[in-house]
C-alpha cells in the first residue's frame, strides 16, 4: 500500500539491523501508549487523595478512555488516511506526550480527564497504523512476525510499565510517574520520526482509503471484527476481577497472589514471540489452537468456582489456568489483527481501525457485564467468559477461511 524509501532490501533480508531497529521503535511506541493508558490502575488511591475525589470516580477514567477511543477511531483513521503513515504515528505520539503533560500538571479532576481524552482520541489512530507500518517494513511472508514484535511492547507494558508507574506513584507521587511517561513518549516520538520511512501513499492507493473505503460493507472484515468483539468481551468480563479470581477461586493469597499475577504477565510476554512463526505459516491453526486454549482455561476456572473447597490440587489446576489465560490472551491479539488487516485488502489501516473499534467495544462491554455478574457470583462471571469464548471459538472454527493467509501456498496454511 505504501512505497517507503530504502526498503527494497527487505525482500531478501527482512531482518536487517535497520529493520530490527524500526520494529523496536514501534514496539516502544506500543509499550509507552499502553503504559500511559493503564497508569491510573496503579495510581487510583494516589490520584484520588491528591485531587480529593473518590477512587470510583478515578476508576471511570478507564471506561471513558475506552468509550472515546471506540467512538473516534474510525472517523480519525478516515480523516488521516491520506497522510504518510509515519506522520499519523508521530502525531499520535505527540498527542500522547501532550496529554501526559496535561495530566501531570492537572490542578483538578476535570483537567486530568481532559488530558486523558486527548490520549484516547489518538489511541485508535496509533493502533490502526502501527501494525500495518510494521508489516510494510518486511515481506508479506514475515507479516505475522512483524505484527507480533509490536505486541512484545504491549506485554512489557503490563509486566514492567504498569508495575513501575504504580511503584513510582506510591513512592514519589503519581505526577512524577506521569512526567516520566511524558518524557518517554517524547523520546519515542522523536525516534519514530528519525528511524521510520515516511511511507507516502501512491496515487492509485489513494483510491481505496479514506471516504472511498467501504470496510463496513466488507463481510469478511465485519465477521473478523464481530468475532474479535465477542472474544474480547469474554476476556474482560473476568479480567477486571482477576485478583479476586486468583484469591477466591484459585485459592492463592498473600505474596503468592502477586507472583501469580506476575506469571500471568510473563506468560503473555513469552507467548508472543513463540506464535510469530506459526502465525505466518499456519494462521488458521494458530488462532483455533489459541482460542481453544482460552476456552479451556475459562472452563476450568468456572469448574473451580463452582467447587466448595480449596486444595493443593485445585490451586495447582487454577494456577495453570491463569498462566494459560495470560499466555493465550496476549498471543491471540496479533492473530486477530493480522486477519483484519488481510481482510482490508488495499487499505489495511482502515481495516485495522475497524478492528480497534471492535476491540474497544469489547473492553467496555466486558467490563460492564463483568461488573453486573460480579455482584451475583464469581461462578456466573466465569461462566459468561467461558461461554463467550466458546461462541467465538465456534465462529472461528466454522469460518476458518477468514484467517487464511493469501501469500501462502495451500500446503502452507
Swiss-Prot record:
<feature type="transmembrane region" description="Helical">
    <location>
        <begin position="378"/>
        <end position="398"/>
    </location>
</feature>
<comment type="function">
    <text>Active efflux pump that plays an important role in chloramphenicol resistance. Overexpression causes pyrazinamide resistance.</text>
</comment>
<feature type="transmembrane region" description="Helical">
    <location>
        <begin position="89"/>
        <end position="109"/>
    </location>
</feature>
<dbReference type="Pfam" id="PF07690">
    <property type="entry name" value="MFS_1"/>
</dbReference>
<keyword id="KW-0046">Antibiotic resistance</keyword>
<comment type="similarity">
    <text>Belongs to the major facilitator superfamily.</text>
</comment>
<feature type="transmembrane region" description="Helical">
    <location>
        <begin position="55"/>
        <end position="75"/>
    </location>
</feature>
<keyword id="KW-0472">Membrane</keyword>
<dbReference type="GO" id="GO:0022857">
    <property type="term" value="F:transmembrane transporter activity"/>
</dbReference>
<dbReference type="InterPro" id="IPR020846">
    <property type="entry name" value="MFS_dom"/>
</dbReference>
<dbReference type="InterPro" id="IPR011701">
    <property type="entry name" value="MFS"/>
</dbReference>
<feature type="transmembrane region" description="Helical">
    <location>
        <begin position="226"/>
        <end position="246"/>
    </location>
</feature>
<keyword id="KW-1133">Transmembrane helix</keyword>
<dbReference type="GO" id="GO:0055085">
    <property type="term" value="P:transmembrane transport"/>
</dbReference>
<feature type="transmembrane region" description="Helical">
    <location>
        <begin position="353"/>
        <end position="373"/>
    </location>
</feature>
<feature type="transmembrane region" description="Helical">
    <location>
        <begin position="286"/>
        <end position="306"/>
    </location>
</feature>
<dbReference type="InterPro" id="IPR050189">
    <property type="entry name" value="MFS_Efflux_Transporters"/>
</dbReference>
<dbReference type="InterPro" id="IPR036259">
    <property type="entry name" value="MFS_trans_sf"/>
</dbReference>
<feature type="transmembrane region" description="Helical">
    <location>
        <begin position="256"/>
        <end position="276"/>
    </location>
</feature>
<dbReference type="GO" id="GO:0046677">
    <property type="term" value="P:response to antibiotic"/>
</dbReference>
<keyword id="KW-0812">Transmembrane</keyword>
<feature type="transmembrane region" description="Helical">
    <location>
        <begin position="312"/>
        <end position="332"/>
    </location>
</feature>
<feature type="transmembrane region" description="Helical">
    <location>
        <begin position="176"/>
        <end position="196"/>
    </location>
</feature>
<feature type="transmembrane region" description="Helical">
    <location>
        <begin position="150"/>
        <end position="170"/>
    </location>
</feature>
<keyword id="KW-1003">Cell membrane</keyword>
<feature type="transmembrane region" description="Helical">
    <location>
        <begin position="110"/>
        <end position="130"/>
    </location>
</feature>
<feature type="transmembrane region" description="Helical">
    <location>
        <begin position="23"/>
        <end position="43"/>
    </location>
</feature>
<dbReference type="GO" id="GO:0005886">
    <property type="term" value="C:plasma membrane"/>
</dbReference>
<protein>
    <recommendedName>
        <fullName>Chloramphenicol efflux pump Rv0191</fullName>
    </recommendedName>
</protein>
<keyword id="KW-0813">Transport</keyword>
Amino acid at each position: 500500500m505504501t512505497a517507503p524509501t530504502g526498503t527494497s532490501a527487505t525482500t531478501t533480508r527482512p531482518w536487517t539491523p535497520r529493520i530490527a531497529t524500526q520494529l523496536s521503535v514501534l514496539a516502544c511506541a506500543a509499550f509507552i501508549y499502553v503504559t500511559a493508558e493503564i497508569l491510573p490502575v496503579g495510581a487510583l488511591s494516589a490520584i484520588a487523595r491528591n485531587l480529593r475525589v473518590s477512587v470510583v470516580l478515578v476508576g471511570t477514567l478507564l471506561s471513558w478512555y475506552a468509550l472515546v477511543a471506540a467512538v473516534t477511531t474510525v472517523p480519525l483513521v478516515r480523516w488521516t488516511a491520506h497522510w504518510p503513515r509515519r506522520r499519523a504515528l508521530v502525531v499520535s505520539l505527540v498527542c500522547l506526550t501532550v496529554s501526559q503533560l496535561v495530566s501531570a500538571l492537572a490542578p483538578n479532576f476535570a483537567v486530568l480527564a481532559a488530558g486523558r481524552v486527548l490520549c484516547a482520541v489518538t489511541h485508535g489512530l496509533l493502533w490502526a497504523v502501527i501494525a500495518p507500518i510494521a508489516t510494510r517494513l518486511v515481506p508479506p511472508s514475515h507479516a505475522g512476525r512483524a505484527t507480533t514484535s509490536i505486541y512484545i511492547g504491549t506485554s512489557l507494558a503490563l509486566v514492567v510499565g504498569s508495575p513501575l508507574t504504580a511503584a513510582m506513584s506510591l513512592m514519589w507521587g503519581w505526577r512524577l510517574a506521569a512526567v516520566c511517561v511524558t518524557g518517554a513518549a517524547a523520546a519515542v516520538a522523536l525516534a519514530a520520526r528519525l528511524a521510520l520511512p515516511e511511507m507516502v501513499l501512491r496515487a492509485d492507493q489513494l483510491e481505496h482509503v479514506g471516504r472511498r473505503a467501504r470496510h463496513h460493507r466488507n463481510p469478511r472484515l465485519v465477521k473478523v471484527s464481530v468475532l474479535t468483539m465477542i472474544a474480547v468481551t469474554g476476556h474482560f468480563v473476568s479480567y477486571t476481577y482477576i485478583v479476586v479470581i486468583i484469591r477466591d477461586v484459585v485459592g492463592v493469597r498473600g505474596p503468592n497472589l502477586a507472583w501469580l499475577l506476575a506469571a500471568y504477565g510473563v506468560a503473555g510476554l513469552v507467548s508472543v514471540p513463540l506464535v510469530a512463526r506459526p502465525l505466518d505459516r499456519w494462521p488458521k491453526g494458530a488462532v483455533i489452537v489459541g482460542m481453544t486454549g482460552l476456552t479451556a482455561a475459562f472452563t476450568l476456572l468456572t469448574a473451580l468456582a463452582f467447587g466448595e473447597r480449596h486444595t493443593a490440587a485445585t490451586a495447582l489446576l487454577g494456577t495453570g489456568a491463569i498462566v494459560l489465560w495470560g499466555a493465550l490472551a496476549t498471543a491471540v491479539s496479533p492473530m486477530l489483527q493480522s486477519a483484519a488487516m488481510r481482510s482490508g485488502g488495499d487499505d489495511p489501516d482502515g481495516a485495522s481501525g475497524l478492528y480497534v473499534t471492535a476491540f474497544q467495544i469489547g473492553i467496555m462491554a466486558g467490563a460492564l457485564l463483568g461488573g453486573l455478574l460480579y455482584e451475583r457470583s464469581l461462578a456466573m462471571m466465569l461462566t459468561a467468559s467461558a461461554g463467550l469464548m466458546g461462541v467465538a471459538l465456534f465462529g472461528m472454527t466454522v469460518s476458518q477461511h477468514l484467517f487464511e493467509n493469501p501469500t501462502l501456498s495451500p500446503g502452507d496454511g
